[in-house]
Regions:
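Hydrophobic, membrane-embedded alpha-helices of multi-pass small-molecule transporters
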Residues: 1-10, 28-33, 37, 71-79, ...
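Inter-helical loop and helix-membrane interface segments of multi-pass membrane transporters/permeases
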Residues: 1-30, 79-104, 169-187, 218-221, ...
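Hydrophobic core segments of alpha-helical transmembrane domains in multi-pass membrane transport
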Residues: 1-4, 30-41, 59-70, 157-166, ...
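Membrane-interface loop-to-helix entry segments
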Residues: 12-17, 24-32, 36-85, 218, ...
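Membrane-interface alpha-helices at helix entry/exit sites of multi-pass transporters
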Residues: 29, 134-150, 224-232
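Extracellular/periplasmic helix-exit of transmembrane alpha-helices
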Residues: 65-83, 91, 95-98, 130-132, ...
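Transmembrane helix-bundle signature of multi-pass membrane transporters/permeases
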Residues: 132, 144-149, 199, 234, ...
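C-terminal structural cap/anchor segments
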Residues: 159-213
Length: 287
């Protein structure tokens, strides 16, 4: 939770607000850490409730806006798809061992960013799914699969295409700044402001969700007595994420993700027979 859960999320908020509103990352870090502390330590759930209510609507509006950008630049879509595959698999500029290294880096960053998007294989979303009030675990698991599809295949693909067809990937902007510039190009300053605010809500709600993940794990491993210390560390690292260098924050997050994924994937492998048996039983009963 100290990487993907708070530092990268806070860094995205800081980058978005700095790009759209010229707000200093340090100021953003103080405010985000304060709001996070009010919810995590102070139990002020109204802030979390507002984010929870706004995020679904913003997600719909954001997706519609990105789709509108694709429609405005629909003549560039074939070139966009071509550029994606050429940059991913072309080895024109390198050869031999260097070509293999380039391919390895492309796959490595693709997998790393995909994991950041959907948390697949980390075992984190299971904490929330297991707390749901459902009679059939298979049904809940299928919803988890759909979440990955909707988030990565739909929203992330639309975002990437919107950035490419609008040309903002060549502007020198980083991170959230590319999406903001894409929306500003299509809808003016209001579009950029909307994306900045939407990213802030998306990321802040993710921070709160990951704080819950971490609290449950600390409570399970060490008991309630250390939860307070974890909460303070989590809030502090959230502020650090806002002022940290983008590449450093992402590298730390990728490392932490790997440390979570390895033991979880091993456990999934050993439990796969049980999962297959439960799934086959569920399909047999509902078909």
């Amino acid at each position: 939770s100290f990487g993907i859960g708070n530092m990268t999320q806070a860094n995205s908020i800081a980058g978005a607000l700095e790009s759209a509103l010229r707000i200093a990352p340090l100021s953003t870090g103080i405010v985000v850490a304060l709001l996070c502390g009010l919810v995590v330590l102070g139990g002020i759930k109204r802030i979390a409730s507002v984010a929870e209510r706004c995020v679904p609507l913003m997600a719909v509006v954001y997706t519609a806006g990105a789709a509108a950008i694709l429609w405005l630049h629909r003549d560039r879509l074939p070139d966009a798809f071509s550029a994606i595959f050429q940059e991913a698999f072309s080895l024109r500029a390198v050869g031999g061992g260097a070509g293999g290294y380039a391919m390895m880096r492309a796959v490595r960053y693709g997998v790393a960013r995909g994991i950041f998007s959907n948390e697949a294989g980390l075992g984190s979303s299971v904490i929330v799914n297991s707390a749901s009030n459902v009679k059939e675990p298979v049904r809940q698991g299928m919803w988890g699969i759909f979440e990955v599809f909707a988030d990565t295949i739909v929203m992330c693909t639309i975002t990437a295409l919107a950035i490419i067809v609008s040309g903002t990937h060549l502007s020198g902007a980083e991170g959230a700044g590319m999406s903001i510039e894409a929306f500003e190009g299509a809808f003016g300053r209001a579009g950029g402001l909307f994306v900045a605010i939407a990213i802030a809500f998306f990321a802040f709600s993710s921070i709160l969700g990951w704080s819950y993940y971490g609290e449950r794990v600390v409570e399970y491993l060490f008991g309630r007595k250390l939860v307070g210390i974890y909460q303070l560390l989590f809030i502090g690292m959230t502020a650090v994420g806002c002022v940290g260098h983008l590449e450093l924050v992402w590298s730390l997050s990728d490392t932490f993700n790997g440390l979570m994924a390895i033991p979880n994937l091993i456990a999934v492998l050993f439990l796969s027979n049980q999962v297959f048996a439960i799934t086959r039983d569920y399909v047999r009963r509902v078909s």
